[in-house]
A protein has these predicted regions:
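N-terminal small/glycine-rich loop or linker at the start of catalytic domains
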Residues: 1-13, 46-48
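Hydrophobic faces of well-ordered beta-strands that scaffold small-molecule active sites
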Residues: 5-7, 35-37, 79-82, 100-102, ...
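Conserved, mostly hydrophobic/aromatic
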Residues: 8, 27, 92
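Active-site beta-loop-alpha junctions enriched in small/polar residues
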Residues: 10-12, 40-42, 84-86, 103-105, ...
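Catalytic domains of carbohydrate-active enzymes, especially glycoside hydrolases
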Residues: 22-41, 95-96
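Glycine-enriched alpha-helix->loop->beta-strand junction motifs that scaffold or abut catalytic
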Residues: 31, 91-100, 122-128, 146
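Glycine-rich, proline-tolerant flexible connector loops at the mouths of alpha/beta enzymes
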Residues: 33-60, 109
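Active-site-adjacent beta->alpha loops and helix N-cap segments on the catalytic face
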Residues: 59-65, 102-125, 134-145
Length: 146
């Protein structure tokens, strides 16, 4: 069995589509099968943070997702995301992503939309990569997904 290699770009693209595209291109050249970004709303997770302007700039909007997904498709590398709110999952679904990722912070069930996001992902019956890096309730997550 061949390993499926994911280039974890997350939010490390400085809010610049050109930087994100360069990272996607380099990931493809390095042999990655997929690139993975994070799709969250700054207002949900970082309200009042001292670095608000920097954080807000790194937010992956629907328009940016579409641009990066189209670019990834053109290069022949899979694009997917950790979606942090239900509408992000719906939008990713409309673009035809093949899989989703549950972020570890979503698995802790402490984010504002954790349960709704997990339920939405489950409804699409696609492969899900689950991160338990921050803990979380493995049994509860399995139950929701099944």
């Amino acid at each position: 069995m061949r390993a499926f290699i994911v280039a974890e770009i997350a939010s490390n693209w400085e809010g610049s589509v050109s930087v994100a595209k360069k990272l996607i291109k380099e990931s493809k050249k390095a042999g990655a099968d997929a690139v993975k970004f994070q799709m969250w709303r700054a207002s949900d997770l970082y309200q009042g943070h001292p670095d608000w302007k920097i954080i807000k700039k790194s937010e992956l909007t629907f328009a940016k997702v579409k641009t990066l997904k189209t670019y990834s498709d053109k290069l022949g590398i899979e694009f997917f995301c950790s979606g942090f709110y239900p509408e992000s999952i719906e939008y990713l679904q409309s673009l035809g992503v093949k899989r989703y990722k549950l972020a570890s912070r979503t698995c802790t069930l402490n984010d504002p939309h954790s349960l709704e996001t997990i339920t939405k992902i489950s409804s699409y019956k696609k492969p899900v990569v689950i991160s338990m890096g921050m803990g979380g309730n493995k049994n509860k997550i399995k139950k929701i997904l099944n």
